[in-house]
Amino acid sequence: MGNAATAKKGSEVESVKEFLAKAKEDFLKKWENPTQNNAGLEDFERKKTLGTGSFGRVMLVKHKATEQYYAMKILDKQKVVKLKQIEHTLNEKRILQAVNFPFLVRLEYAFKDNSNLYMVMEYVPGGEMFSHLRRIGRFSEPHARFYAAQIVLTFEYLHSLDLIYRDLKPENLLIDHQGYIQVTDFGFAKRVKGRTWTLCGTPEYLAPEIILSKGYNKAVDWWALGVLIYEMAAGYPPFFADQPIQIYEKIVSGKVRFPSHFSSDLKDLLRNLLQVDLTKRFGNLKNGVSDIKTHKWFATTDWIAIYQRKVEAPFIPKFRGSGDTSNFDDYEEEDIRVSITEKCAKEFGEF
């Protein structure tokens, strides 16, 4: 690398540092003074269920005054309490209202009533990466790399704010109208300076240190990135079995097999991300994220252009209009019931 290139690299690293310092300032302001109750259920017209979960659902809604479409996450307070997810739910809202990055879904409104908590986010009509990946089978390496680069930048941003994401998987990555990623579902995200111990995540994506009940840190996100890149490029995850316990055995074994079509650069990157030994895992070494960004598999990636969304996406989802739901599955519809008495007031006071 010539002197000019070295100088350019140096100035890029400096400008990233400046950017992240400013981002942290912005984040902390909102983290310390979270927005509360800036809308109500009556402001929205409910259109269709986009997804369901163990303690709530996500619906397409239309803001009556602005006619904008949004995705509204509705959480049943009593179910959240029953499933011991109070802390996770409060984390999700507090984090989402404070972050700001091109590849993170934006929280526009949050409010609660006697029965439910509501988070209203921008609606991403392209649907989940999961459904496109299953339909196409697998992504070419350049296609996978385009998405992977956005996750690398997003994790660099989140980790600089002391946030661990902990739930990377194709179901939580939405494809927007320009073919870029929007990371959604911050239900397991957490602000942690040192280590944390909670067992959470999706079996196929869990890092070995989580399975082994060790204290863990941000490095679990880099492991999950390895799993995601593998799954995007192969069409199936690196560790899979019928029962979670069998998956866990494979994960902690430290053995990964690669399809013959994987390039040698891809295999090398994955061996360094799917590294059981934390002292050797990329993203967790003294150079931090730059071991990943400067890896040969990313040699063609223009990180600044990706951040600026100037790179042409390999795939643009098809949809008709901003309220189209054809990229989402159908679910049984259910009325939103609101109690006449307030439930769990104490638990969700800060929401």
Curated annotation (Swiss-Prot):
Residues 299-351 form the AGC-kinase C-terminal domain. The modification Phosphoserine is found at residues 11, 140, 322, 339. The modification Deamidated asparagine is found at residue 3. PROSITE patterns: AGC_KINASE_CTER, PROTEIN_KINASE_ATP, PROTEIN_KINASE_DOM, PROTEIN_KINASE_ST. It is found in: Cytoplasm; Cell membrane; Membrane; Nucleus. Residues 44-298 form the Protein kinase domain. GO terms for cellular component: cAMP-dependent protein kinase complex; centrosome; ciliary base; cytosol; extracellular exosome; nucleoplasm; nucleus; plasma membrane. Activated by cAMP. Its cofactor is Mg(2+). It is linked to Cardioacrofacial dysplasia 2: An autosomal dominant disease characterized by dysmorphic facial features, congenital cardiac defects, primarily common atrium or atrioventricular septal defect, and limb anomalies, including short limbs, brachydactyly and postaxial polydactyly. CAFD2 patients may show developmental delay of variable severity, intellectual disability, autistic features and focal seizures. This is cAMP-dependent protein kinase catalytic subunit beta. It comes from Homo sapiens.
